[in-house]
UniProtKB/Swiss-Prot annotation:
Keyword check for Transmembrane: no
PROSITE patterns assigned to the protein according to its UniProt record, in alphabetical order: HTH_GNTR
Official protein name in the record: Uncharacterized HTH-type transcriptional regulator MG101 homolog
Alphabetically ordered keywords of this record: DNA-binding, Transcription, Transcription regulation
Domain of life: Bacteria
Membrane keyword on record: no
SUPFAM superfamilies: Winged helix' DNA-binding domain
InterPro entries attached to this UniProt entry: Tscrpt_reg_HTH_GntR, WH-like_DNA-bd_sf, WH_DNA-bd_sf
Parts of the chain that traverse the membrane: none
Length: 222
């Protein structure tokens, strides 16, 4: 009988396979992907695991299933820039993601990340920045992701949702936040949170910097 850990590993492989097919545009929007049976045979997996994975992808709007049409289809092409409305329990947000491939990690941010994990070389990391806006379209949060090109290319608008980031940020491998540091920007007094994420083998994947612009959470006399 397959162990829970082996089951999780197999699930990661299947997630990675499907996501890379979509990200590489080998399966563009509208493409019918492999059936449950085909995936079950290809990966020597159980039907229940395949259905769990497909249901998760359905919930993230990466694939769709239409009544009257057999099979699952790619819902949309995975682009690297967008203007996307998301919804949480209280506040609608408009999230704009811009690629900053020519921008490297600022020295001050590199020093902070290095203080968290000195074993990672942050010297040549590049970044993606996501700006989130409130219902009045006022910018209240900036998220910056730093890593190597092959890591950054997996990002899409859905990665701004925390659970999706954990599930899929690194080609389908489960990602865990292992280290975090909270501080205050000397000039703006905005709250800054620095996070490092690792895979389940404790290998560093990506760094994230969160800057909260909402004046209600600025630190006074810091």
């Amino acid at each position: 009988m397959i162990s829970a850990k082996e089951q999780a590993k197999k699930g990661q492989i299947i997630y990675r396979y499907i996501l890379l097919k979509i990200q590489s545009f080998k399966w563009p929007a509208g493409t019918r992907i492999f059936s449950e049976r085909q995936l079950e045979i290809r990966f020597a997996s159980s039907r229940s695991l395949i259905r769990t994975i497909l249901n998760t992808l359905l919930g993230k709007d990466l694939i769709r299933h239409t009544k009257g049409n057999a099979g699952y289809f790619v819902a949309k092409n995975a682009g690297f820039s967008f203007f996307h409305k998301t919804q949480d329990n209280k506040l609608p947000k408009w999230a704009k993601l811009s690629t900053l491939m020519k921008n490297h990690l600022r020295e001050v941010d590199r020093d902070v990340f290095s203080s968290i994990d000195s074993g990672v070389d942050f010297g040549n990391f590049k970044g993606l920045e996501a700006k989130l806006f409130d219902e009045n379209k006022k910018n209240f949060l900036n998220l910056s992701f730093f890593g190597k090109d092959d890591v950054l290319q997996i990002f899409s608008e859905q990665n701004l949702q925390e659970q999706f980031f954990k599930d899929f940020a690194y080609n389908g491998i489960v990602v865990e936040r292992k280290s975090s540091l909270i501080c205050v920007d000397d000039e703006t007094k905005n709250l800054l949170i620095y996070d490092l994420f690792y895979d389940d083998n404790n290998k560093f994947i990506v760094a994230m910097r969160s800057e909260y612009l909402n004046p209600r959470i600025k630190i006074i006399n810091a």
